[in-house]
Every structure is written in C-alpha cells, then in structure tokens.
C-alpha cells in the first residue's frame, strides 16, 4: 500500500501524491467517518477534562521542580501526568538571577555588534500559512548565554529525564540514547514591554506534508493509518529517528528528532501577555492526520498544509482541538517549558504587553544516528560562526566579538556535538 504514494523526497506534483494517498488510506481504513467519529468522541472527553480543570482554576500543565529532577524525586504519578498532557514546566531550571544575567548579556552581545544596524529582516517564510505575525525572533545562535545554557549540566539532566519518558528500545533496537542530547542551536525571542503582536496560529512542527507522505512517518503512524487507534502510542520512538523532512532550500526545517520542543525563560512572564498555548493531548495528532480524509476536504488538499511550511491547525478544520488550547502558567526567568514533538501549540496575541517576553529555544534531541549527523554540521557552523544548516543562511555572527567558540565547550558540549571526550 505505502509504496503507491510515499516518497522520501518532495514529490514533483504533491497534489497528485495527496490524491493517491487519500485513495490508498481510505481503502485501508474502511469506514473513515466511523473511525473519525470514535476518535472525536475520545478527544472530546479529554477536551472536557481539560476545560473543567481550567474552569476550576486548577493547573493543566504539569509543573515540577528542577531540584526534584536532579535528586531523582519525580514521582511515577508526575511522569504519567506529563505523558497524558504532553507538556511540562520545570520550575527553577536555572537560578532566576543567572537567567536575567544571560538576558542582559544577550542584549550586550547584540549591541556590541550593532545588530540593529545590520539586520536585514526575516530570512524565511516558514510560518507563512498561519494567521498572525511573527514573534520577535532574532537569528542569533552563538552567544555565550545560549551556549552556556545548552551545554549546562542542568540542561543535560532535564533532557535525560524528558527523553526517558519515551519508549526508546523495542525489538532489540535502541532508537536513541536518552542520556546524551545533541546541541540544536535555535534562535532567541526578545519581545519588549508595550509590544502589540498578533501572536502565532496553532500548528505543529517536525514535518507537515511529510506526516502523510514520508515512508518513515507511515511507519510511525501505522496504527493511526490502519485504524488501530487504541494501539497508537505517541511516546514510542520506533521509526521516528528515521524521519528526514523534505528539503525546501534556504528555509527553516528540523534535521533532528526532538522528543520535546522547549524554551527557557529569560524574563518573568505574566498570564495574558502573549504566552505559549498548547493542546495538551499528544494523541490529537491522530485527529489531525485523519481529518483530511473526510469528504468535506478538497481531494488534493490536507486542511491547509503546504510544502516547506508548518502544519496549521485551524478553527475551520479542527475546532475541537482549538477549544483545548491552554496557556502556560505564570513563569519566572530561569523556568523552562517543554512540549512533545507532536503537540499542537500557538502563541497568543497581546496588546501593550506588560513586561518582557524573552526566551531562548532549546529542545531535547537525543543522540541517534540522524541527530549525530546534524551535530557534526553544528560543530562546523560553530567554528565559522555561521547560521546552522536548518535555518536561513543569514550568517550575522561570523565576525562578531564575544561569540562562543569551540574552545569554550565543556565536556557536555563536546559530547553533545559528537566529539570524542
């Protein structure tokens, strides 16, 4: 079945591939509407549970302390709660004063190298299908602050804890090493007080069209595409490390497998100030994957999916999921926020923002063959101060003063870049 439409590279005629895919999957699934209705009922129960908690003022996001992670005191119940919700907040991941110091050092780094004078505007249109403006993203990767956080013991401990929530061994194969994560350099967000922003519409990353057409994703989502939804486990890593997103040149993609996306707060954050929201239901990806197979979606479309863009989730096609969007709680600088790689997320709009909204994006990307290959490219980019391969080639930092260099790597950093230590 899969060989009739799957492709490791972007099909020349992706709309024809979508039509072929729908024909094959409908034949395989049988009564798609009945399967989708049952899934919708299950998801609706979860949505009601989430919204009841919100109405009572109870926490939806699991919150744990870094001290408990470090001491090995996280309970089985807390682990299960993270797996049920697909997200977590780590309080006190870094001391607040250290995070505020990093924030100031980022500003000093930008000012010293006259970033405002040399900045040429956004280098990509990755979020182009979403209703909203871009958050204030700076294409900076190699500041001391970012790299110190990435190679810190605190980050390594948190990443290992999160990676171990997954099933990473099956059928005699270890899909990844949970205790070493590669450095995945990403950008920073700096959003000043008084900002008015449209935010960012609900979406998922790690492939859009790919989730239907890639052979590896067909294996990842086999139980969704064959209708065995009760057997689908979003926490099983089998075949996820074999996924290679389509190459659409000089835009944003993700060449690594991330167990969790994440960011670390560099400022305190108040509710209602343009914060991250998620749909805290990891299984909602099954709803997203099956929805385009229903009769009301044009035969060559996937509910707004386009090559080289994020996967949009919208009120038009996914109203049940949008209903469950849930904000992160109040944060302090030094707290970190994490969400499963399939989890739908958005950034809320804000008018006249109170306080700063500054973060550095640092995910959990455990060591495996795919991630090691990218880590070697990261090392080469670090040597030159170049933009990493997954991002537009803007290369602002090549001659910047004060940027992080190979000589600044500690043992965690060297291990995370696949260097012999």
From Swiss-Prot:
UniProt-recorded name of the protein: Uncharacterized protein YbiU
Superkingdom in the source lineage: Bacteria
Pfam families: Gig2-like
Encoding gene per record: ybiU
Lineage summary: Bacteria, Pseudomonadati, Pseudomonadota, Gammaproteobacteria, Enterobacterales
Organism: Escherichia coli (strain K12)
């Amino acid at each position: 079945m899969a060989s009739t439409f799957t492709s490791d590279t972007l099909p020349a005629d992706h709309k024809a591939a979508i039509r072929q895919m729908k024909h094959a999957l409908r034949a395989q699934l049988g009564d798609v509407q009945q399967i989708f209705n049952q899934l919708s009922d299950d998801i609706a129960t979860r949505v009601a549970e989430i919204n009841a908690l919100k109405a009572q003022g109870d926490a939806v996001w699991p919150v744990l302390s870094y001290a408990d992670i470090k001491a090995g005191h996280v309970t089985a119940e807390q682990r299960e709660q993270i797996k049920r919700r697909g997200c977590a907040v780590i309080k006190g991941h870094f001391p607040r004063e250290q995070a505020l110091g990093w924030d100031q050092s980022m500003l000093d780094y930008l000012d010293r190298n006259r970033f405002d004078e040399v900045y040429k505007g956004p280098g990509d249109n990755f979020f182009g299908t979403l209703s909203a403006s871009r958050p204030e993203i700076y294409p900076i990767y190699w500041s001391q602050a970012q790299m110190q956080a990435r190679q810190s013991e605190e980050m390594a401990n948190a990443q290992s804890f999160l990676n171990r929530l997954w099933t990473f061994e099956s059928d005699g194969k270890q899909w990844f090493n949970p205790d070493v994560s590669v450095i995945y350099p990403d950008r920073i967000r700096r959003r000043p007080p008084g900002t008015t922003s449209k935010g960012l519409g609900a979406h998922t990353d790690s492939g859009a069209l790919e989730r239907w057409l890639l052979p590896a994703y067909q294996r990842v989502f086999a139980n969704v595409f064959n209708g065995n939804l009760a057997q689908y486990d979003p926490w099983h890593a089998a075949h996820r490390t074999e996924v290679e997103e389509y190459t659409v040149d000089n835009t944003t993609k993700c060449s690594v497998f991330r167990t969790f996306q994440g960011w670390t707060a560099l400022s305190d954050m108040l509710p209602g100030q343009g914060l991250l929201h998620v749909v805290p239901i990891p299984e909602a990806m099954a709803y997203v994957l099956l929805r385009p197979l229903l009769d009301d979606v044009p035969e060559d479309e996937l509910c707004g999916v386009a090559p080289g863009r994020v996967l949009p989730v919208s009120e038009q096609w996914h109203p049940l999921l949008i209903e469950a969007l849930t904000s992160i709680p109040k944060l302090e600088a030094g707290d970190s926020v994490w969400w499963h790689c399939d989890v739908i997320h958005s950034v809320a709009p804000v008018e006249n923002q109170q306080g700063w909204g500054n973060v550095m994006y640092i995910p959990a990307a455990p060591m495996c063959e795919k991630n090691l290959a990218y880590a070697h490219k990261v090392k080469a980019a670090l040597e030159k101060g170049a933009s990493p391969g997954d991002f537009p080639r803007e290369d602002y930092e090549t001659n910047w003063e004060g940027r992080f260099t190979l000589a600044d790597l500690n043992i965690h950093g060297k291990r995370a870049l696949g260097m012999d230590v």
